[in-house]
Structure formats: C-alpha cells, structure tokens
Amino acid sequence: MTIAFQLAVFALIATSSILLISVPVVFASPDGWLSNKNIVFSGTSLWIGLVFLVGILNSLIS
C-alpha cells in the first residue's frame, strides 16, 4: 500500500510540474487556448483525481 501511495504522490508532483509549465504557455500563445483547451481540461481533471487519490491513500496508510 505504501508503494501505491508513493507512486500517487510522485504522479501528483509530476502532473503539477507539467501543468505549471504548460498552462501559461497555452495562454501566452496566440491560438493556444482554442487548440489546446481539451488537453488543459484533461490535465486539470487528472490533477484533481490525483489529489483525491492521494488523500484517500493517505487516510488508509495513517
């Protein structure tokens, strides 16, 4: 169970880092938002899901 928690935390950190870089780039590009809107929403949904997963796994471990 601990390894699943560690992998979920790593995935959350990696997703946060990717979104931290990609979202401002998408908003700064001229046609970026219209062409990459679905990717940003998918990344945000993944991040929210990982936050809940880490919270659930943390409650099971502690």
From Swiss-Prot:
Superkingdom, taxonomy of origin: Eukaryota
Coiled coil: none
Membrane protein topology class: Multi-pass membrane protein
Protein purpose: May control the interaction of photosystem II (PSII) cores with the light-harvesting antenna, regulates electron flow through the 2 photosystem reaction centers. PSII is a light-driven water plastoquinone oxidoreductase, using light energy to abstract electrons from H(2)O, generating a proton gradient subsequently used for ATP formation.
Annotated source species: Gossypium hirsutum (Upland cotton)
SUBUNIT field: PSII is composed of 1 copy each of membrane proteins PsbA, PsbB, PsbC, PsbD, PsbE, PsbF, PsbH, PsbI, PsbJ, PsbK, PsbL, PsbM, PsbT, PsbY, PsbZ, Psb30/Ycf12, at least 3 peripheral proteins of the oxygen-evolving complex and a large number of cofactors. It forms dimeric complexes.
GO biological process terms on file: photosynthesis; photosystem II stabilization
Family: Belongs to the PsbZ family.
Keywords assigned by UniProt, alphabetized: Chloroplast, Membrane, Photosynthesis, Photosystem II, Plastid, Reaction center, Thylakoid, Transmembrane, Transmembrane helix
Intracellular or extracellular location(s): Plastid, Chloroplast thylakoid membrane
InterPro entries hit by this protein: PSII_PsbZ, PSII_PsbZ_sf
Signal peptide as annotated in the record: none
Classification via HAMAP family: PSII_PsbZ
Major subcellular site: plastid
Name this protein carries in UniProt: Photosystem II reaction center protein Z
The keyword Repeat is annotated on this UniProt entry: no
Transmembrane annotation, as ranges: 8-28, 41-61
Pfam name, any one: Ycf9
Key word Plastid present: yes
A GO CC term assigned to this protein in UniProt: chloroplast thylakoid membrane
